[in-house]
Amino acid sequence: MRMSNLYIPTLKEVPKEAEVVSHQLMLRAGLIRNLTAGVYSFLPLGYRVIKKIEGIIRKVMDESGAQEVLMPVIHTSDLWKESGRWEKFGPLMIKFEDRKGREYCLGPTHEEVITDLVRDEIRSYKDLPLNLYQIQTKVRDEIRPRFGLMRSREFIMKDAYSFDRDYEGLDKSYQVMYGAYTEVFNRCGLEVRAVEADTGAMGGKDSHEFMVLAESGEDDIAFCNRCDYAANVERAEARYVKSEKNEEIKPLEKVETPGKKKIDELVEFLKMPSEKMIKAVAYLADGEPVLALVRGDDELNEVKLINYLDVIELTPVVDEDFPQYYNSYAGYVGPIGLKNVRIIADRKVKDIVNGICGANEENYHFINVNPERDFSVEKYLDIRKVKEGDQCPHCEGTIEIKSGIEVGHIFKLGTKYSESMGATYLDENGKEQPIVMGSYGIGVTRLVAAAIEQNHDEHGIIWPKAIAPYQVIILPLGKGDEVNKRAEELYLELKDNNIEVLLDDRNERAGVKFNDADLIGIPLRLTIGSRSLDKGVIEARVRGTGQDYEISVEDAIKDIKKLLENVK
């Protein structure tokens, strides 16, 4: 492709709306343009990267035995009501009615549609196992689209669905997809780590996320510094070490704490450590009041709480509603004396001796609080967020936390959808059984952003060779006929050798060409000038390493191929 013909509107300045590097560089390099919040158009260079990633995905998925299909973006409400997710998916789902008043949504995911697709076709155990995948647009009404392609309202996703006779078969399908995903990301030239994850609204049994480690990532990953344990913080656990109760238990006492609502204020006012505090977090769980308790030096993990409660909606109680639901006040709510409120506590709360909690009276707290003696809870369980320095649940190592970008997610759905939607098969004995399912997703457009977050410098993008829009860029410098002639010859020779090449034939200064080449991140840059031609060489630079080479004009194709073989 000649750059004089290429639609590539680069920008010199960083757009104000772009917060993260990938968004900044995709706008500056002319890969994308914004239509409205969270909705983007892909320009030629950006779309070539998309097609490269899709090509890798298709090849690996086909090699794994999966078959490609294409399902609609518009879904009927009936299917989602069958699965029970029409309401549970919440405001992320964009719903609408047609002119006849029938309800539809724009598909945020395709479990319901794929289950409907196979339930009338799979009749016998002989039809299983089966794995179907698609690469399709998804739509989710994100409350705050941000970070460019990392959190957008419309995005391209590869989603696959496995269908097996039993859980043993699902385990095999899951491992095949786990391996396939690892291979996809390796072929894309990315460093990705698989971590245990929460299943969320997808439901099901086990789940793993594939994360690109990056400071701009919205997800926090907890991992052990000694073993291979890694999990999304939403799912992560730490070893529970029971505290020794060697302190004399004191009588309960109510004390005045004027205006002291926060943990750090109470620590200072009462001269007590935060681990003595019982932090109470008030929610309405599907309209029912729930009080969650964690130690004052811990943070509540809402995902763990939601999973235990198994509710559709968990809403923090606003200040003015405390008297109505808790007969208490914001900042002073506590578990003692509460009626008609479900109390759930982290297991570390049970070990507190002579602690502090709200007295359900404005400007007052209880001291010398002892769980079990002073209040009862429905359940003690792990509902705290892990933090750095916690002990690994599997070894003697300690937990570290880093940010990451989720680029893939796999789930063992089990029979969640097949049972609710009647997707069954007949086994060898003629008995009807629910199909056991798995779901596997890769965020194609998000993968583009993650690749840039992991591969860039102060000058621009550094594309991994496998997903670069072009492999080589030729920069003819100067106006001599011999320079342009040799650049044209090399351009045509590279094309004849199936090497994807850009020829910067624009009438621009050398500095502009160099800057644009670095910005768009083509792996190998070839510079042709009169001085180098006088020496019989072409100057080559590898974008990723910055290393320079001189290659012979006569053996240019052979030398370029050799250089490309060593480019990552």
UniProtKB/Swiss-Prot annotation:
UniProt subcellular location: Cytoplasm
Keyword set, alphabetical order: Aminoacyl-tRNA synthetase, ATP-binding, Cytoplasm, Ligase, Nucleotide-binding, Protein biosynthesis
Highest taxon listed in the record's lineage: Bacteria
One Pfam family in the UniProt entry: tRNA_edit
GO cellular component: cytosol
One Gene Ontology term from the biological process aspect of the record: prolyl-tRNA aminoacylation
MF terms (GO), sorted A to Z: aminoacyl-tRNA deacylase activity; ATP binding; catalytic activity, acting on a protein; proline-tRNA ligase activity; transferase activity
EC numbers on record: 6.1.1.15
Catalytic activity: tRNA(Pro) + L-proline + ATP = L-prolyl-tRNA(Pro) + AMP + diphosphate
Domain notes: Consists of three domains: the N-terminal catalytic domain, the editing domain and the C-terminal anticodon-binding domain.
Family: Belongs to the class-II aminoacyl-tRNA synthetase family. ProS type 1 subfamily.
HAMAP family from the UniProt entry: Pro_tRNA_synth_type1
Function: Catalyzes the attachment of proline to tRNA(Pro) in a two-step reaction: proline is first activated by ATP to form Pro-AMP and then transferred to the acceptor end of tRNA(Pro). As ProRS can inadvertently accommodate and process non-cognate amino acids such as alanine and cysteine, to avoid such errors it has two additional distinct editing activities against alanine. One activity is designated as 'pretransfer' editing and involves the tRNA(Pro)-independent hydrolysis of activated Ala-AMP.
Name used for this protein in its record: Proline--tRNA ligase
Species, as recorded: Halothermothrix orenii (strain H 168 / OCM 544 / DSM 9562)
Gene name of the encoded protein: proS
